[in-house]
Amino acid sequence: MKNSKNLLVRYLSIFLIFGSINIIAQDNDEAIEEVVVTGSYIKGSPTDGASPVEIISRDTIDALSASTVADITANLSINSGSENNTDSFTSGATQGSTNVNLRGLGLTSTLVLLDGKRHTLAGIAANDGSVYVNTSIIPVNAIERVEVLKEGAASVYGSDAVAGVVNYIF
């Protein structure tokens, strides 16, 4: 009797061990949905919260006949005080450079992102001595859309986003 119980326990344990492999090895036929996040690791969309996000699409850029990023920047309702310098008579050392100044808080208070990543500062200083991101190096034809966060986002992005964030998506 003892051997038959022992044998039964062995068969049962072998069945449980090898029987569960088929359960684990089953294929999963679920479709995987692609999720693209630009800007931050905080979940949500521009319409979820109270943050005012303006999205300038490729169609709008084409309708503006924008040939430079300065043309796009000049048409932002929240932009104030950008130094988009094209000639040497008014610009000094910043000739040919463009920048973004949201709400007139200064060139260093607006964060500029390229596909959600921080852009490096230019090697030149503005007329007031501040260092900024030179947006004239961004090709307009490569821009798919521009996302503008119109409020301070220093708690999410850091101190250089006090005035807001401009994200150029390619």
Q: For the regions a protein language model found, what residue spans apply to each?
A:
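N-terminal periplasmic accessory domains that precede
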Residues: 69-72, 100-101, 113-115, 133-136, ...
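Flexible glycine-/small-residue-rich
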Residues: 39-41, 57, 102-106, 114-116, ...
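Extracytoplasmic beta-strand/coil segments of soluble accessory domains associated
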Residues: 74-118
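Short, glycine-/polar-rich solvent-exposed loops and beta-turns at beta-strand/coil boundaries
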Residues: 28-30, 49, 79-96, 126, ...
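N-terminal Sec signal peptide and the immediately downstream disordered periplasmic leader
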Residues: 1-66, 71-75, 135-138
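Short acidic/polar hinge/loop motifs at secondary-structure boundaries
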Residues: 117-150
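Extracytoplasmic
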Residues: 32-34, 48-53, 64, 97, ...
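Short beta-strands and strand-coil junctions in structured, solvent-facing domains, enriched
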Residues: 42-44, 62-63, 108-109, 118-121, ...
